[in-house]
Amino acid sequence: MNLKNKSIVVLLSGGLDSSTVTGIAKKSEAKIFGLSFDYGQRHKKELNSASIIAKHFDIEEFKIIKLDLSLWGGSSLTDSQKNIPIEGVQANKIPNTYVPGRNTIFISVALSYAEAIDADFIGLGVNALDYSGYPDCRPDYIKKFQELADLANKRGRENNPIKLWTPLLDLNKEEIIKLAFDNHVPFDKTWSCYSGNSKPCGKCDSCRIRNAAYEKWLNNKNKK
């Protein structure tokens, strides 16, 4: 996909995936508008990382939207009374780190922003293969949201739709890490951990998936 001189709103959380999408867009010479959310999550480490990534890639604009999903909780990421799981991802079971409706809300806000600034794309770091099985990170969800987006705004109705761009959707975490380094993402400045300690916990699902993939990528890199 040719992104040169195209405007793109990237949902930039500060994690590895969204930072990689930002890096790919930057290398493609797109005009990047970053959007993060202070949504009542357990910590603000990822927002700090998002700000660092936005500055690193010198994007056009970076906004942090206040939207408090902790008002009703429903997830261990927005409710401190729920424990973050450390026993691993269970097959065919959605973990309690899933935040009800989060991606639907965030992409809807991004769609409004994109339409207001006449952006061509919304960049998402969702990937379906080795993440936690969230329902709003899957190909069928992205396909249906695109259909909704095409009906829900002026550009879509005028046959000039804003497209959801998901370059990582079918990649595993090792492949994403390779892309991150290939696109000059400051890997050590991204934040994936569910906890807000000074250093990543190394125990939560997100840490373990990231660390295992990094070790695999590094081993393969050193063999070459």
From Swiss-Prot:
Gene3D superfamilies: HUPs (3.40.50.620). Binds 1 zinc ion per subunit. Its cofactor is Zn(2+). CDD domains: QueC-like. Its EC number is 6.3.4.20. Zn(2+) binds at C193, C201, C204, C207. SUPFAM superfamilies: Adenine nucleotide alpha hydrolases-like. InterPro entries: QueC, Rossmann-like_a/b/a_fold. Coiled coil: none annotated. Keywords: ATP-binding, Ligase, Metal-binding, Nucleotide-binding, Queuosine biosynthesis, Zinc. ATP binds at L12, S13, G14, G15, L16, D17, S18, S19, T20, V21, T22. One of its GO terms (biological process) is queuosine biosynthetic process. Pathway: Purine metabolism; 7-cyano-7-deazaguanine biosynthesis. It catalyses: 7-carboxy-7-deazaguanine + NH4(+) + ATP = 7-cyano-7-deazaguanine + ADP + phosphate + H2O + H(+). One of its GO terms (molecular function) is zinc ion binding. Catalyzes the ATP-dependent conversion of 7-carboxy-7-deazaguanine (CDG) to 7-cyano-7-deazaguanine (preQ(0)). Belongs to the QueC family. This is 7-cyano-7-deazaguanine synthase. The lineage of its organism: Bacteria, Bacillati, Cyanobacteriota, Cyanophyceae, Synechococcales.
